[in-house]
Amino acid sequence: TEKQSKLNDVMNEKTYTWPKNKPTLQAGVAAIESTSGKILAIGSARNRKGERVLSYATDINKQIGSTAKPLFDYGPGVEYINWSTYTIIKDEKYSYTGGGVMSNYDFRYKGDLTLRESLRDSRNVPALKAFQQVDNSKIYEFVTSLGIVPETSEGSTYLHEAHSIGAFNGSNPLTMAGAYQAFSNGGYYYEPYSINKIILRETQEEFNYSSNKQKVMSDSTAYMITDILKMVASDTGVRSAVGTPIALKTGTTNYDKETLNSLGYPSSATPDGWIVGYTPNIVMAMWTGYDTNTKGEYMLNSQMTSHRNALYRALAKAVFDKTGKDFKRP
């Protein structure tokens, strides 16, 4: 399809200039139709040559960073305890229940913030507080209904608090596109699929395939989260690049201290960058980063942020339709 070939051009360095001297920097992308779950385009790797081995769109498990916040924190807060975009959450010095200080990306605290401000500026402390306010089993129900597989002990549904900032065994772009789809379409989940129909060779019988539609959140929850994430799309320059209403969430992750020390990386080195964005018609999730660690090759947080946003802008131009259609207010 046209979308697939334009996406390939970005991934194969024809229409996007990848950062210099970063040969092992990778990416994976998945785009689906938001009203059906049908897969529209897949980017399995940068410069994929020869046999398809590992697909970074479907076969990885990477920590999802702040793209977790609408799923584990604010979505459940709005859905189950009737929060509004104006609910106040205090951004202050704060610790996990089990100890361990939660810090923000800028190592500062901003005091009283609305839910809108907390999510737009991706503050970690308000995210953890939001996660703690909602019944843990309800959060589990919410994210699993969206296709996310959280990190739990055998036979338990208890979610540890680091899920609030996406620090768990992780996900992949196709699963993340599926999860955000419910925010784009008024609260429905369709499992992503790629086969439209099956024809039996003997009898020529045709079976059309479609994904089951499941209502997973109220239309008002979907709209409130979307309304906030539209601001992030403007903040990252994606809205103006695409020229149509779009909502998105960004995420980055950190290396743990041992890895930093063993590889000799600076503390601001970042292994993963994420963006999950959507219009009323299409959802596209992208991971970019390092699948393997090579001594001497890394991205600083600032480099990752700028590459991540620029790569997503290029992919967004390739994949999103310029319909001008906005999200429906319930």
Regions found by a protein language model. Give the residues of each.
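A penicillin-recognizing enzyme superfamily signal
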Residues: 1-18, 29-31, 41-42, 49-60, ...
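Short coil/loop linkers at secondary-structure junctions
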Residues: 83-84, 149-151, 326
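Short, small/polar residue-rich loop motifs at catalytic or cofactor-binding pockets
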Residues: 23-26
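Conserved catalytic neighborhood of penicillin-recognizing serine enzymes
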Residues: 82-139, 160, 189, 201-231
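Gly/Ser-rich catalytic serine loop of serine hydrolases
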Residues: 59-69, 167-170
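Active-site SXXK
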Residues: 37, 63-89, 118, 178-183, ...
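Mid-domain, small-residue-enriched loop/turn segments at the edges of structured enzyme/sensor domains
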Residues: 100-104, 135-178
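Structural recognition of the beta-strand scaffold that forms the well-ordered cores
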Residues: 28-32, 39-43, 88, 117, ...
